[in-house]
Protein backbone atom coordinates (compact mmCIF):
# COMPACT_ATOMS: atom_id res chain seq x y z
CA UNK A 1 0.00 0.00 0.00
CA UNK A 2 1.16 3.50 -0.77
CA UNK A 3 1.59 6.32 1.73
CA UNK A 4 -1.62 8.01 0.58
CA UNK A 5 -3.59 4.82 1.23
CA UNK A 6 -2.11 4.56 4.72
CA UNK A 7 -3.13 8.16 5.42
CA UNK A 8 -6.69 7.53 4.23
CA UNK A 9 -6.85 4.36 6.32
CA UNK A 10 -5.53 6.14 9.42
CA UNK A 11 -8.10 8.92 8.98
CA UNK A 12 -10.90 6.37 8.66
CA UNK A 13 -9.64 4.52 11.74
CA UNK A 14 -9.51 7.76 13.70
CA UNK A 15 -13.07 8.62 12.67
CA UNK A 16 -14.21 5.13 13.65
CA UNK A 17 -12.50 5.37 17.04
CA UNK A 18 -14.00 8.81 17.66
CA UNK A 19 -17.44 7.52 16.79
CA UNK A 20 -17.12 4.51 19.09
CA UNK A 21 -15.85 6.74 21.89
CA UNK A 22 -18.80 9.12 21.51
CA UNK A 23 -21.24 6.19 21.59
CA UNK A 24 -19.65 4.80 24.75
CA UNK A 25 -19.73 8.19 26.49
CA UNK A 26 -23.37 8.76 25.49
CA UNK A 27 -24.37 5.29 26.73
CA UNK A 28 -22.59 5.81 30.05
CA UNK A 29 -24.19 9.21 30.57
CA UNK A 30 -27.67 7.94 29.76
CA UNK A 31 -27.21 4.83 31.92
CA UNK A 32 -26.26 7.05 34.87
CA UNK A 33 -29.32 9.25 34.35
CA UNK A 34 -31.53 6.18 33.94
CA UNK A 35 -30.36 4.66 37.24
CA UNK A 36 -30.88 7.94 39.11
CA UNK A 37 -34.38 8.37 37.68
CA UNK A 38 -35.28 4.76 38.47
CA UNK A 39 -34.26 5.24 42.11
CA UNK A 40 -36.23 8.49 42.20
CA UNK A 41 -39.43 6.99 40.78
CA UNK A 42 -39.34 3.97 43.06
CA UNK A 43 -39.53 6.37 46.01
CA UNK A 44 -42.85 7.79 44.79
CA UNK A 45 -44.67 4.84 43.24
CA UNK A 46 -47.47 3.04 45.05
CA UNK A 47 -46.12 -0.32 46.25
CA UNK A 48 -49.63 -1.79 46.13
CA UNK A 49 -49.78 -1.38 42.34
CA UNK A 50 -46.67 -3.55 41.88
CA UNK A 51 -47.44 -6.25 44.44
CA UNK A 52 -51.05 -7.00 43.52
CA UNK A 53 -52.55 -10.48 43.45
CA UNK A 54 -53.04 -10.12 39.69
CA UNK A 55 -49.60 -10.66 38.16
CA UNK A 56 -50.80 -9.21 34.86
CA UNK A 57 -51.49 -5.76 36.33
CA UNK A 58 -48.16 -5.79 38.17
CA UNK A 59 -46.32 -6.67 34.94
CA UNK A 60 -48.08 -3.90 33.05
CA UNK A 61 -47.22 -1.36 35.75
CA UNK A 62 -43.57 -2.45 35.76
CA UNK A 63 -43.32 -2.00 31.98
CA UNK A 64 -45.00 1.42 32.21
CA UNK A 65 -42.62 2.39 35.04
CA UNK A 66 -39.59 1.55 32.89
CA UNK A 67 -40.97 3.71 30.07
CA UNK A 68 -41.51 6.55 32.55
CA UNK A 69 -37.96 6.09 33.80
CA UNK A 70 -36.67 6.41 30.24
CA UNK A 71 -38.73 9.58 29.72
CA UNK A 72 -37.59 11.14 32.99
CA UNK A 73 -33.96 10.35 32.11
CA UNK A 74 -34.43 12.16 28.79
CA UNK A 75 -35.96 15.12 30.66
CA UNK A 76 -33.00 15.25 33.03
CA UNK A 77 -30.65 15.05 30.06
CA UNK A 78 -32.44 17.98 28.43
CA UNK A 79 -31.96 20.02 31.62
CA UNK A 80 -28.23 19.25 31.72
CA UNK A 81 -27.75 19.77 27.98
CA UNK A 82 -27.15 23.52 27.86
CA UNK A 83 -25.12 23.78 31.11
CA UNK A 84 -22.93 20.87 30.00
CA UNK A 85 -22.30 22.57 26.65
CA UNK A 86 -21.37 25.89 28.29
CA UNK A 87 -19.02 24.24 30.79
CA UNK A 88 -17.43 22.13 28.03
CA UNK A 89 -16.68 25.26 26.02
CA UNK A 90 -14.98 26.90 29.00
CA UNK A 91 -12.96 23.76 29.74
CA UNK A 92 -11.73 23.61 26.15
CA UNK A 93 -10.81 27.29 26.34
CA UNK A 94 -8.82 26.76 29.54
CA UNK A 95 -7.16 23.48 28.48
CA UNK A 96 -7.04 23.51 24.68
CA UNK A 97 -4.32 20.86 24.20
CA UNK A 98 -4.81 18.64 27.22
CA UNK A 99 -4.60 14.96 26.28
CA UNK A 100 -7.15 13.83 28.88
CA UNK A 101 -9.99 15.96 27.53
CA UNK A 102 -9.62 15.12 23.85
CA UNK A 103 -12.90 13.23 24.11
CA UNK A 104 -14.68 16.52 24.85
CA UNK A 105 -15.28 18.06 21.43
CA UNK A 106 -17.95 19.65 19.28
CA UNK A 107 -18.93 16.36 17.67
CA UNK A 108 -19.82 14.84 21.06
CA UNK A 109 -21.86 17.89 22.11
CA UNK A 110 -23.68 17.99 18.78
CA UNK A 111 -24.44 14.28 19.05
CA UNK A 112 -25.86 14.72 22.55
CA UNK A 113 -28.17 17.50 21.34
CA UNK A 114 -29.39 15.28 18.50
CA UNK A 115 -29.95 12.34 20.85
CA UNK A 116 -31.95 14.45 23.30
CA UNK A 117 -34.07 15.79 20.44
CA UNK A 118 -34.64 12.26 19.10
CA UNK A 119 -35.51 10.71 22.45
CA UNK A 120 -37.77 13.65 23.36
CA UNK A 121 -39.77 13.10 20.18
CA UNK A 122 -39.85 9.36 20.81
CA UNK A 123 -41.03 9.76 24.40
CA UNK A 124 -43.69 12.40 23.76
CA UNK A 125 -45.12 10.92 20.57
CA UNK A 126 -44.87 7.17 21.20
CA UNK A 127 -43.63 5.97 24.60
CA UNK A 128 -45.80 8.01 26.97
CA UNK A 129 -49.05 7.49 25.00
CA UNK A 130 -48.17 3.79 24.84
CA UNK A 131 -47.59 3.68 28.61
CA UNK A 132 -50.92 5.39 29.34
CA UNK A 133 -52.96 3.23 26.96
CA UNK A 134 -51.14 0.15 28.20
CA UNK A 135 -52.11 0.76 31.83
CA UNK A 136 -55.73 1.53 30.87
CA UNK A 137 -56.18 -1.34 28.39
CA UNK A 138 -57.94 -4.61 29.15
CA UNK A 139 -57.67 -6.37 25.81
CA UNK A 140 -60.21 -6.64 23.00
CA UNK A 141 -63.54 -8.27 23.72
CA UNK A 142 -63.38 -11.97 22.96
CA UNK A 143 -59.59 -12.12 22.90
CA UNK A 144 -57.47 -14.08 25.34
CA UNK A 145 -56.62 -12.30 28.54
CA UNK A 146 -53.01 -11.48 29.18
CA UNK A 147 -50.28 -8.97 28.58
CA UNK A 148 -50.14 -9.76 24.86
CA UNK A 149 -53.82 -8.89 24.43
CA UNK A 150 -53.22 -5.56 26.11
CA UNK A 151 -50.27 -4.93 23.82
CA UNK A 152 -52.47 -5.50 20.74
CA UNK A 153 -55.12 -3.07 21.99
CA UNK A 154 -52.49 -0.49 22.94
CA UNK A 155 -50.80 -0.69 19.53
CA UNK A 156 -54.12 -0.23 17.73
CA UNK A 157 -54.99 2.77 19.92
CA UNK A 158 -51.53 4.24 19.35
CA UNK A 159 -51.83 3.87 15.57
CA UNK A 160 -55.21 5.60 15.58
CA UNK A 161 -53.84 8.39 17.78
CA UNK A 162 -50.82 8.79 15.48
CA UNK A 163 -53.06 9.13 12.43
CA UNK A 164 -55.23 11.67 14.24
CA UNK A 165 -52.25 13.75 15.39
CA UNK A 166 -50.59 13.50 11.97
CA UNK A 167 -53.74 14.79 10.29
CA UNK A 168 -53.99 17.67 12.74
CA UNK A 169 -50.32 18.56 12.20
CA UNK A 170 -50.76 18.45 8.42
CA UNK A 171 -53.80 20.74 8.62
CA UNK A 172 -52.02 23.14 11.00
CA UNK A 173 -48.90 23.28 8.83
CA UNK A 174 -51.03 23.86 5.74
CA UNK A 175 -52.84 26.75 7.44
CA UNK A 176 -49.68 28.39 8.77
CA UNK A 177 -47.43 27.89 5.73
CA UNK A 178 -49.55 26.58 2.88
CA UNK A 179 -46.92 27.02 0.18
CA UNK A 180 -44.36 24.87 1.92
CA UNK A 181 -46.85 22.39 3.33
CA UNK A 182 -48.35 21.76 -0.10
CA UNK A 183 -44.99 20.55 -1.36
CA UNK A 184 -44.51 18.14 1.52
CA UNK A 185 -45.89 14.63 1.38
CA UNK A 186 -46.47 11.93 3.95
CA UNK A 187 -43.06 10.51 3.08
CA UNK A 188 -41.49 13.55 4.77
CA UNK A 189 -42.95 12.60 8.14
CA UNK A 190 -39.56 12.31 9.87
CA UNK A 191 -37.94 15.33 8.23
CA UNK A 192 -40.84 17.79 8.32
CA UNK A 193 -43.95 16.80 10.25
CA UNK A 194 -42.32 15.31 13.34
CA UNK A 195 -40.01 18.35 13.87
CA UNK A 196 -43.03 20.58 13.24
CA UNK A 197 -45.01 18.70 15.89
CA UNK A 198 -42.10 18.98 18.31
CA UNK A 199 -41.87 22.69 17.49
CA UNK A 200 -45.50 23.10 18.57
CA UNK A 201 -44.86 21.10 21.76
CA UNK A 202 -41.74 23.15 22.46
CA UNK A 203 -43.68 26.38 21.95
CA UNK A 204 -46.28 25.09 24.42
CA UNK A 205 -43.48 24.29 26.87
CA UNK A 206 -41.97 27.76 26.46
CA UNK A 207 -45.37 29.33 27.17
CA UNK A 208 -45.75 27.06 30.20
CA UNK A 209 -42.33 28.20 31.42
CA UNK A 210 -43.42 31.81 30.93
CA UNK A 211 -46.33 31.25 33.32
CA UNK A 212 -44.69 28.91 35.84
CA UNK A 213 -41.27 30.55 36.22
CA UNK A 214 -42.42 33.96 37.59
CA UNK A 215 -44.81 32.16 39.93
CA UNK A 216 -42.02 29.83 41.01
CA UNK A 217 -39.59 32.70 41.55
CA UNK A 218 -42.07 34.24 43.96
CA UNK A 219 -42.78 30.90 45.65
CA UNK A 220 -39.08 30.08 46.13
CA UNK A 221 -38.92 32.48 49.08
CA UNK A 222 -41.71 30.73 50.98
CA UNK A 223 -40.42 27.25 50.05
CA UNK A 224 -36.94 28.13 51.28
CA UNK A 225 -38.46 29.52 54.47
CA UNK A 226 -40.11 26.16 55.15
CA UNK A 227 -36.86 24.25 54.64
CA UNK A 228 -34.60 26.51 56.71
CA UNK A 229 -34.74 27.63 60.32
CA UNK A 230 -36.04 31.19 60.52
CA UNK A 231 -34.52 33.67 62.98
CA UNK A 232 -36.66 34.75 65.94
CA UNK A 233 -35.27 37.61 67.96
CA UNK A 234 -37.75 37.68 70.83
CA UNK A 235 -38.82 34.15 71.67
CA UNK A 236 -38.28 31.52 74.34
CA UNK A 237 -38.05 28.08 72.73
CA UNK A 238 -38.19 26.20 76.04
CA UNK A 239 -41.41 27.95 77.01
CA UNK A 240 -43.01 27.20 73.65
CA UNK A 241 -41.93 23.54 73.85
CA UNK A 242 -43.39 23.19 77.35
CA UNK A 243 -46.67 24.81 76.29
CA UNK A 244 -46.90 22.56 73.25
CA UNK A 245 -46.18 19.47 75.37
CA UNK A 246 -48.82 20.45 77.96
CA UNK A 247 -51.46 21.08 75.27
CA UNK A 248 -50.65 17.77 73.58
CA UNK A 249 -50.87 15.91 76.90
CA UNK A 250 -54.23 17.54 77.70
CA UNK A 251 -55.68 16.61 74.32
CA UNK A 252 -54.33 13.06 74.62
CA UNK A 253 -56.05 12.69 78.02
CA UNK A 254 -59.33 13.85 76.51
CA UNK A 255 -59.02 11.31 73.72
CA UNK A 256 -58.13 8.46 76.10
CA UNK A 257 -60.86 9.36 78.66
CA UNK A 258 -63.79 10.83 76.73
CA UNK A 259 -66.21 10.05 79.60
CA UNK A 260 -64.41 12.46 81.95
CA UNK A 261 -66.04 15.42 80.18
CA UNK A 262 -69.81 15.90 80.34
CA UNK A 263 -69.84 17.62 76.92
CA UNK A 264 -69.74 15.53 73.69
CA UNK A 265 -66.29 15.56 72.10
CA UNK A 266 -65.42 15.65 68.41
CA UNK A 267 -62.77 12.93 68.26
CA UNK A 268 -61.76 13.69 64.69
CA UNK A 269 -61.13 17.33 65.57
CA UNK A 270 -59.09 16.33 68.62
CA UNK A 271 -56.95 13.98 66.54
CA UNK A 272 -56.27 16.75 64.03
CA UNK A 273 -55.29 19.11 66.83
CA UNK A 274 -52.90 16.53 68.28
CA UNK A 275 -51.26 16.01 64.89
CA UNK A 276 -50.89 19.77 64.45
CA UNK A 277 -49.28 20.09 67.89
CA UNK A 278 -46.91 17.23 67.14
CA UNK A 279 -45.84 18.88 63.89
CA UNK A 280 -45.35 22.17 65.74
CA UNK A 281 -43.27 20.42 68.39
CA UNK A 282 -41.07 18.82 65.72
CA UNK A 283 -40.41 22.25 64.22
CA UNK A 284 -39.58 23.69 67.63
CA UNK A 285 -37.19 20.80 68.31
CA UNK A 286 -35.54 21.44 64.97
CA UNK A 287 -35.12 25.11 65.88
CA UNK A 288 -33.64 24.24 69.27
CA UNK A 289 -31.12 21.79 67.78
CA UNK A 290 -30.03 24.25 65.10
CA UNK A 291 -26.79 26.11 65.65
CA UNK A 292 -26.62 29.85 66.20
CA UNK A 293 -25.39 30.61 62.69
CA UNK A 294 -28.16 28.47 61.20
CA UNK A 295 -30.78 30.34 63.19
CA UNK A 296 -29.40 33.82 62.61
CA UNK A 297 -27.44 33.72 59.33
CA UNK A 298 -28.65 30.77 57.24
CA UNK A 299 -32.11 32.07 56.44
CA UNK A 300 -31.09 35.71 55.69
CA UNK A 301 -28.22 34.56 53.46
CA UNK A 302 -30.52 32.19 51.56
CA UNK A 303 -33.07 34.96 51.07
CA UNK A 304 -30.32 37.30 49.90
CA UNK A 305 -29.04 34.73 47.38
CA UNK A 306 -32.54 34.18 46.01
CA UNK A 307 -33.09 37.92 45.72
CA UNK A 308 -29.76 38.42 43.93
CA UNK A 309 -30.38 35.57 41.48
CA UNK A 310 -33.91 36.76 40.72
CA UNK A 311 -32.83 40.38 40.29
CA UNK A 312 -29.94 39.30 38.08
CA UNK A 313 -32.31 37.27 35.89
CA UNK A 314 -34.64 40.24 35.44
CA UNK A 315 -31.68 42.53 34.73
CA UNK A 316 -30.29 40.20 32.04
CA UNK A 317 -33.70 39.95 30.39
CA UNK A 318 -34.07 43.75 30.46
CA UNK A 319 -30.66 44.19 28.82
CA UNK A 320 -31.59 41.56 26.24
CA UNK A 321 -34.76 43.50 25.40
CA UNK A 322 -32.62 46.55 24.61
CA UNK A 323 -30.26 44.41 22.53
CA UNK A 324 -33.20 43.08 20.52
CA UNK A 325 -34.15 46.64 19.61
CA UNK A 326 -30.60 47.54 18.58
CA UNK A 327 -28.83 44.45 17.26
CA UNK A 328 -30.34 41.71 15.11
CA UNK A 329 -27.65 39.27 16.31
CA UNK A 330 -29.42 39.07 19.69
CA UNK A 331 -32.20 37.00 18.10
CA UNK A 332 -32.03 33.28 18.99
CA UNK A 333 -30.86 31.12 16.13
CA UNK A 334 -29.50 27.66 15.51
CA UNK A 335 -26.12 26.48 14.35
CA UNK A 336 -25.24 23.23 12.66
CA UNK A 337 -21.63 23.00 13.83
CA UNK A 338 -20.66 23.23 17.49
CA UNK A 339 -17.57 25.44 17.35
CA UNK A 340 -16.36 24.85 20.90
CA UNK A 341 -13.14 26.08 22.43
CA UNK A 342 -12.81 29.16 20.21
CA UNK A 343 -14.47 31.94 22.22
CA UNK A 344 -16.35 32.28 25.48
CA UNK A 345 -20.11 32.68 25.33
CA UNK A 346 -19.99 35.27 28.12
CA UNK A 347 -18.35 38.67 28.21
CA UNK A 348 -17.14 37.91 31.75
CA UNK A 349 -15.33 34.75 30.71
CA UNK A 350 -15.45 31.67 32.93
CA UNK A 351 -17.07 33.60 35.79
CA UNK A 352 -19.89 34.71 33.49
CA UNK A 353 -20.31 31.14 32.23
CA UNK A 354 -20.69 29.89 35.81
CA UNK A 355 -23.32 32.58 36.43
CA UNK A 356 -25.17 31.47 33.29
CA UNK A 357 -25.20 27.84 34.45
CA UNK A 358 -26.40 28.82 37.94
CA UNK A 359 -29.19 30.98 36.50
CA UNK A 360 -30.33 28.22 34.13
CA UNK A 361 -30.59 25.70 36.98
CA UNK A 362 -32.25 28.29 39.23
CA UNK A 363 -34.91 29.13 36.66
CA UNK A 364 -35.56 25.45 35.98
CA UNK A 365 -36.06 24.71 39.68
CA UNK A 366 -38.27 27.79 39.97
CA UNK A 367 -40.38 26.68 37.02
CA UNK A 368 -40.92 23.25 38.60
CA UNK A 369 -41.88 24.88 41.92
CA UNK A 370 -44.26 27.23 40.10
CA UNK A 371 -45.70 24.35 38.08
CA UNK A 372 -46.64 22.34 41.16
CA UNK A 373 -47.79 25.48 43.00
CA UNK A 374 -50.29 26.44 40.31
CA UNK A 375 -53.89 25.42 41.02
CA UNK A 376 -54.22 23.84 37.58
CA UNK A 377 -51.41 21.30 38.06
CA UNK A 378 -51.41 21.01 41.84
CA UNK A 379 -53.23 17.66 41.69
CA UNK A 380 -50.26 16.16 39.80
CA UNK A 381 -47.89 16.78 42.70
CA UNK A 382 -46.21 13.45 43.54
CA UNK A 383 -46.54 12.02 47.04
CA UNK A 384 -44.05 9.80 48.82
CA UNK A 385 -44.97 6.14 48.14
CA UNK A 386 -48.50 7.25 47.23
CA UNK A 387 -48.37 8.28 43.55
CA UNK A 388 -50.47 6.30 41.11
CA UNK A 389 -49.12 5.10 37.78
CA UNK A 390 -51.31 7.56 35.88
CA UNK A 391 -49.93 10.45 37.94
CA UNK A 392 -46.36 9.27 37.32
CA UNK A 393 -47.01 9.25 33.56
CA UNK A 394 -48.53 12.74 33.72
CA UNK A 395 -45.60 14.07 35.76
CA UNK A 396 -43.05 12.60 33.36
CA UNK A 397 -44.80 14.13 30.35
CA UNK A 398 -45.04 17.58 31.96
CA UNK A 399 -41.44 17.51 33.16
CA UNK A 400 -40.23 16.46 29.70
CA UNK A 401 -42.18 19.30 28.07
CA UNK A 402 -40.69 21.81 30.53
CA UNK A 403 -37.13 20.50 30.35
CA UNK A 404 -37.02 20.11 26.56
CA UNK A 405 -38.11 23.75 26.25
CA UNK A 406 -35.39 24.92 28.68
CA UNK A 407 -32.63 25.43 26.03
CA UNK A 408 -35.00 27.45 23.85
CA UNK A 409 -36.27 29.33 26.91
CA UNK A 410 -32.74 30.24 28.06
CA UNK A 411 -31.61 31.37 24.62
CA UNK A 412 -34.81 33.35 23.98
CA UNK A 413 -34.37 35.30 27.23
CA UNK A 414 -30.71 35.97 26.49
CA UNK A 415 -29.42 34.10 29.54
CA UNK A 416 -26.67 32.65 27.35
CA UNK A 417 -25.10 33.30 23.96
CA UNK A 418 -24.79 29.60 23.20
CA UNK A 419 -26.80 29.09 20.02
CA UNK A 420 -29.17 26.16 19.69
CA UNK A 421 -27.68 23.05 18.11
CA UNK A 422 -29.28 20.54 15.77
CA UNK A 423 -33.03 20.54 15.31
CA UNK A 424 -33.56 22.78 18.35
CA UNK A 425 -32.69 25.76 16.15
CA UNK A 426 -35.10 24.82 13.36
CA UNK A 427 -38.20 26.15 15.10
CA UNK A 428 -39.88 28.70 12.83
CA UNK A 429 -41.17 30.95 15.59
CA UNK A 430 -37.63 31.64 16.86
CA UNK A 431 -37.06 33.98 13.92
CA UNK A 432 -40.16 36.06 14.64
CA UNK A 433 -39.01 39.32 16.26
CA UNK A 434 -42.41 40.20 17.72
CA UNK A 435 -42.82 36.83 19.46
CA UNK A 436 -39.33 36.96 20.97
CA UNK A 437 -39.66 40.61 22.03
CA UNK A 438 -43.10 40.18 23.60
CA UNK A 439 -41.93 37.02 25.35
CA UNK A 440 -39.00 38.83 26.96
CA UNK A 441 -41.17 41.78 27.96
CA UNK A 442 -43.85 39.50 29.42
CA UNK A 443 -41.29 37.53 31.43
CA UNK A 444 -39.69 40.67 32.88
CA UNK A 445 -43.07 42.21 33.69
CA UNK A 446 -44.59 39.10 35.27
CA UNK A 447 -41.49 38.35 37.33
CA UNK A 448 -41.27 41.91 38.64
CA UNK A 449 -44.99 41.97 39.46
CA UNK A 450 -44.89 38.64 41.31
CA UNK A 451 -41.81 39.66 43.28
CA UNK A 452 -43.15 43.07 44.28
CA UNK A 453 -46.46 41.56 45.35
CA UNK A 454 -45.06 38.53 47.16
CA UNK A 455 -41.73 39.70 48.50
CA UNK A 456 -43.02 42.84 50.21
CA UNK A 457 -45.79 40.94 51.99
CA UNK A 458 -43.39 38.12 52.93
CA UNK A 459 -40.78 40.52 54.31
CA UNK A 460 -43.41 42.36 56.35
CA UNK A 461 -44.77 39.12 57.79
CA UNK A 462 -41.31 37.74 58.58
CA UNK A 463 -40.28 40.95 60.34
CA UNK A 464 -43.43 40.80 62.45
CA UNK A 465 -42.73 37.16 63.36
CA UNK A 466 -39.03 37.80 63.96
CA UNK A 467 -39.76 40.44 66.60
CA UNK A 468 -42.59 38.41 68.12
CA UNK A 469 -45.23 41.02 67.35
CA UNK A 470 -47.62 38.39 66.02
CA UNK A 471 -48.13 37.02 69.56
CA UNK A 472 -48.91 40.38 71.13
CA UNK A 473 -52.61 41.26 71.72
CA UNK A 474 -52.43 44.50 69.77
CA UNK A 475 -55.74 46.42 69.39
CA UNK A 476 -57.00 47.56 66.04
CA UNK A 477 -55.73 51.14 65.87
CA UNK A 478 -57.94 52.24 63.04
CA UNK A 479 -61.26 51.78 64.89
CA UNK A 480 -60.83 52.57 68.58
CA UNK A 481 -64.33 53.92 69.07
CA UNK A 482 -66.01 51.01 67.37
CA UNK A 483 -64.15 48.52 69.55
CA UNK A 484 -65.19 50.40 72.71
CA UNK A 485 -68.84 50.43 71.64
CA UNK A 486 -68.74 46.67 71.11
CA UNK A 487 -67.21 46.15 74.55
CA UNK A 488 -69.95 48.25 76.21
CA UNK A 489 -72.61 46.34 74.34
Curated annotation (Swiss-Prot):
**Principal location:** membrane
Organism from which the protein derives: Mus musculus (Mouse)
How does this protein sit in the membrane?
Multi-pass membrane protein
Molecular function (Gene Ontology), one example: transmembrane signaling receptor activity
Annotated stretches, region: LCN1-binding: 1-76
UniProt keyword terms in alphabetical order: Cell membrane, Endocytosis, Endoplasmic reticulum, Membrane, Receptor, Transmembrane, Transmembrane helix, Wnt signaling pathway
Q: How does it assemble?
A: Dimer. Can also form higher oligomers. Interacts with LCN1; this interaction mediates the endocytosis of LCN1. Interacts with UBAC2, FAF2, VCP, AMFR, ZNRF3, CTNNB1, LRP6, GSK3B, FZD6, DVL2 and RNF43. Interacts with GSK3A. Interaction with LGB and SCGB1A1 is controversial.
- Please report the name of this protein according to its UniProt entry: Protein LMBR1L
Annotated function: Plays an essential role in lymphocyte development by negatively regulating the canonical Wnt signaling pathway. In association with UBAC2 and E3 ubiquitin-protein ligase AMFR, promotes the ubiquitin-mediated degradation of CTNNB1 and Wnt receptors FZD6 and LRP6. LMBR1L stabilizes the beta-catenin destruction complex that is required for regulating CTNNB1 levels. Acts as a LCN1 receptor and can mediate its endocytosis.
Note down the stretches annotated as region Interaction with LGB: 1-59
What are the recorded Gene Ontology BP terms? hematopoietic stem cell differentiation; negative regulation of canonical Wnt signaling pathway; receptor-mediated endocytosis; T cell apoptotic process; T cell differentiation; T cell proliferation; Wnt signaling pathway
Q: Which domain of life is it from?
A: Eukaryota
- Looking at the UniProt entry, the stretches that span the membrane are 22-42, 67-87, 115-135, 155-175, 197-217, 306-326, 351-371, 389-409, 432-452
Disruption outcome: Mice exhibit severely impaired development of all lymphoid lineages, compromised antibody responses to immunization, reduced cytotoxic T-cell killing activity and natural killer (NK) cell function, and resistance to cytomegalovirus infection. T-cells are predisposed to apoptosis and die in response to antigen-specific or homeostatic expansion signals. Impaired differentiation of hematopoietic stem cells into the lymphoid primed multipotent progenitor (LMPP) and common lymphoid progenitor populations that give rise to T-cells, B-cells, and NK cells.
Membrane topology (Cytoplasmic): 43-66, 136-154, 218-305, 372-388, 453-489
Extracellular membrane side: 1-21, 88-114, 176-196, 327-350, 410-431
Tissue specificity comment? Highly expressed in the bone marrow, thymus, spleen and lymphocytes.
Gene Ontology CC: endoplasmic reticulum membrane; plasma membrane
Pfam families, per database record: LMBR1
- Location of this chain's protein in the cell: Cell membrane; Endoplasmic reticulum membrane
Question: Is Manganese found in the keyword set?
Answer: no
Amino acid sequence: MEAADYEVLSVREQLFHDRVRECIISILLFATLYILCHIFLTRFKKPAEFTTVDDEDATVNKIALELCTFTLAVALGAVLLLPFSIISNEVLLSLPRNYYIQWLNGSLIHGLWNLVFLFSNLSLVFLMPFAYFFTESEGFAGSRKGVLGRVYETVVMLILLTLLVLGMVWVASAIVDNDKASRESLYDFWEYYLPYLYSCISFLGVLLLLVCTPLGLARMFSVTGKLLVKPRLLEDLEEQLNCSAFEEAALTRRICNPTSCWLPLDMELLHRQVLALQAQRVLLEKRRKASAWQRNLGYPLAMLCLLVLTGLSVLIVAVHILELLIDEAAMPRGMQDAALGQASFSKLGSFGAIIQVVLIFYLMVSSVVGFYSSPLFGSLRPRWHDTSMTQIIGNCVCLLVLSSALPVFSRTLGLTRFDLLGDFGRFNWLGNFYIVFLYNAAFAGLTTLCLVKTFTAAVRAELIRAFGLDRLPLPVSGFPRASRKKQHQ
